[in-house]
Amino acid sequence: MQIGVCYYPEQWPRTMWAEDARRMAELGITHVRIGEFAWSRMEPRAGVYVWDWLDDAIETLAARGLKIVLGTPTAAPPRWLVDAVPDLLPARADGTRWNYGSRRHYDIASEAWRAHCVRITEAMAQRYGAHPAVVAWQTDNELGCHDTVPSW
């Protein structure tokens, strides 16, 4: 049986990653999902990609034989994007906008959000698409969670 876990290396000091990977492998974990909420770490400013931490996380996990399910970070647009495109935030039925800060803080009908999703996903695919440890991709996360499907 193959068993997977979610892991958020961006939330932990790098000094913990190797020990976490060792424990996962020791417990029989085979797959680790990472990345789905890390857009602000991958692209802290528009068009400025920072991959070193993700490169290191993938290599650290792969060194223990763990396979990677790489999540696109589209479930958590970064602050700079929301500031640049305020109507990217979802609106309630009464027209008031959500605040920035929770996951899924975007309107699925937003063309700007979709265009930026294509851009970050293509950048990730170029960098990690042929990586031998990346065995699957997760596109977005929890569609419909937090009542995010209605678009007003």
Give the residues covered by each predicted segment.
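Structural preference for beta-strand elements that scaffold enzyme active sites
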Residues: 2-4, 31, 67-69, 133-138
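Active-site region of glycoside hydrolase catalytic domains
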Residues: 59, 63-65, 77-152
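The substrate-binding groove and active-site-proximal loops of carbohydrate-active enzymes
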Residues: 3-14, 35-53, 99-118, 125, ...
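Aromatic-lined substrate-binding rim segments of carbohydrate-active enzymes
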Residues: 18-98, 122-125
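An acidic-aromatic substrate-binding cleft motif
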Residues: 1-16, 22-23, 27-30
